[in-house]
Amino acid sequence: MWGLGARGPDRGLLLALALGGLARAGGVEVEPGGAHGESGGFQVVTFEWAHVQDPYVIALWILVASLAKIGFHLSHKVTSVVPESALLIVLGLVLGGIVWAADHIASFTLTPTVFFFYLLPPIVLDAGYFMPNRLFFGNLGTILLYAVVGTVWNAATTGLSLYGVFLSGLMGDLQIGLLDFLLFGSLMAAVDPVAVLAVFEEVHVNEVLFIIVFGESLLNDAVTVVLYNVFESFVALGGDNVTGVDCVKGIVSFFVVSLGGTLVGVVFAFLLSLVTRFTKHVRIIEPGFVFIISYLSYLTSEMLSLSAILAITFCGICCQKYVKANISEQSATTVRYTMKMLASSAETIIFMFLGISAVNPFIWTWNTAFVLLTLVFISVYRAIGVVLQTWLLNRYRMVQLEPIDQVVLSYGGLRGAVAFALVVLLDGDKVKEKNLFVSTTIIVVFFTVIFQGLTIKPLVQWLKVKRSEHREPRLNEKLHGRAFDHILSAIEDISGQIGHNYLRDKWSHFDRKFLSRVLMRRSAQKSRDRILNVFHELNLKDAISYVAEGERRGSLAFIRSPSTDNVVNVDFTPRSSTVEASVSYLLRENVSAVCLDMQSLEQRRRSIRDAEDMVTHHTLQQYLYKPRQEYKHLYSRHELTPTEDEKQDREIFHRTMRKRLESFKSTKLGLNQNKKAAKLYKRERAQKRRNSSIPNGKLPMESPAQNFTIKEKDLELSDTEEPPNYDEEMSGGIEFLASVTKDTASDSPAGIDNPVFSPDEALDRSLLARLPPWLSPGETVVPSQRARTQIPYSPGTFCRLMPFRLSSKSVDSFLQADGPEERPPAALPESTHM
């Protein structure tokens, strides 16, 4: 697979000797051969290097590349000056020299099959899946001009210039024709996306400049492959046999290959989005669909002789919105890290094997004039093409490309493994000077990656190019940006112009009305309250950072430095179970579980020692983490159970929410929570005494002060209801709905009719039946306080200005005192005629 040579068994013999020594030291008999030797006896251990040679060598090379990457980043001074790609090429040269010194043969090399089918797809898929779509499509015209016109310009000018110098006799006697020079020019025109990503990510240029260079490197590969195939077929036919019809077919082939590859990528993107819509019950295999279907788009385009790079790029671009909305948060994290890991590993292996492949004397043919003139021509014509195309673009671009940006664009035309793989694919029988082309390509790749990669960062700093800012846009910026988009879209619509904003608005409307309904699951299509989602994420981050800070300082740091902020922000009181949510269970679990006698000690003991013990006890009880139950970690092939850290973070989040709600109420009402609880308790006991003296527990209408309590049987969850799913709760938003039903609301004392307090019949009963985990038991006793947490899901369900009550009639004493007595309606006359 890696172009292994024939001397593998010799290296395996050395490894066999080493393993044999270890085995004999351990008392194990090791003899070469099969399971039965010449003596006919059974051998305990046999050495089968040839059986595992290929996968073992591949695993070792991946391990060496990964360890080298770790070693590079141990010294920040080196990586801040030298690009990682250049270091990997140098490492490959060193390893290739060691292998050559041991075997005197190029045992390992980067073959085109391995590069195009196994190493390049993960890199391009990662670039497409994480592509900033708005920035990419906003500069799509500029990117296409540089990718199409610029690539044709570079290929034609480089090939024709080299052919002109060859005719002058400066290159000596070479067996090269015009078509051979044009074929070589098409190879040199390929700006490699791997090299561009590796260098420009470390430079951190501004977003517009980066997306132009990166987009050009992605899209110009289609033009490069088309030109390569056209000129290779012309070379096979011979210059005398090429007709005008063949040239027209070559031009048509460019559009077919480019547009066909793009269409294949879009079709597979929609297929991937549609498949992930129905993976709700098989979450564990969601990441597999993302990688398999994307890779199938690449292979399908390669099978149809279309642009495979464009196919997998647009597959990632078009599917990212729908896939991220359909899959779970855990699957999205898996896809993100796996894709980054594969892309980084493939990039590391590519650059290292570029260095290893160069250590092979049999591929080198030196021609000083050809090599130097190639370097000069690709640099000069790249700069000329950028200047001419930018002059044309600036006449229509709103944001002009400054001369400094043009210098970076000209200097960023890096060549890499794409050019090397294409030149290795050349047929040596048809292209007589293949070794010269290979040698020159290696020199060009090393020059652009190492020299230009080393100097581009100082050049950017010297020219004071605008750098990218790694920060989140503020809320004010987001609001104004969205407002400007709507305003510009309206202006273009009124004036009759079709611009970027008009097209973006029409596409958003089409996507929202048709595509999202087909490619997104229904739960993802619902309008969600983003403010609540952001609040949910902030609380989770707050809980995680709080626990991390506590672990860093030590478990008893709260005792040594108790601060007011820590007391207010986090509450480590027990929370209710998600399975049992009845009022009786909540009241039972509200009792302190540790040393109940400490409550009475505060009233009797007054010594300093006792006071310190009580403070220490209550501090430990409040702040140390107390697990609810012992979780049984069972293995499951089809489900991904949440880890202990996720459960603890979720529990701390609920405690934080409960503490903040209590702090908010006490601040708003200006009451102490202990005094308030005592008043409520006294009022409740008085109400019970009054109810006990009245038959059926109903107060007359003339009573000036009425109160009511919640019936426990009305608030208990039914046994037939499903318990809430923990995984869906982790990935969902915050729900501020208490368990109030219409039946409960109708069973209440009499009072004044008020339609404001009547419950909404259109509201879903299942939503009302869910009790927030952070809602304290006191909330279920006082309906007026519980109503403060009943925030609707979205503006579409915001139906009233007043909170829900358990009764459709007001029971406030002052309203009953001021309101008129209820009287039967007066009988109307049968006829109201005069």
Curated annotation (Swiss-Prot):
Entry comment on modification after translation? Phosphorylated by PKA, which inhibits activity. Phosphorylation at Ser-663 by SGK1 is associated with increased abundance at the cell membrane. Phosphorylation at Ser-718 by CSNK2A1 regulates SLC9A3 activity through the formation of multiple signaling complexes.
Gene3D superfamilies with a match to the protein in the record:
6.10.140.1330
So which residues are the signal peptide here?
Answer: 1-25
According to the UniProt record, where is the region Interaction with NHERF4?
590-667
Entry text on domains: The C-terminal intracellular domain is subject to extensive post-translational modifications and binding partner interactions which regulate transporter activity, scaffolding functions, downstream events and localization.
Family membership: Belongs to the monovalent cation:proton antiporter 1 (CPA1) transporter (TC 2.A.36) family.
Protein name from the UniProt record: Sodium/hydrogen exchanger 3
| Source organism of the structure | Homo sapiens (Human)
Gene from which this protein is expressed: SLC9A3
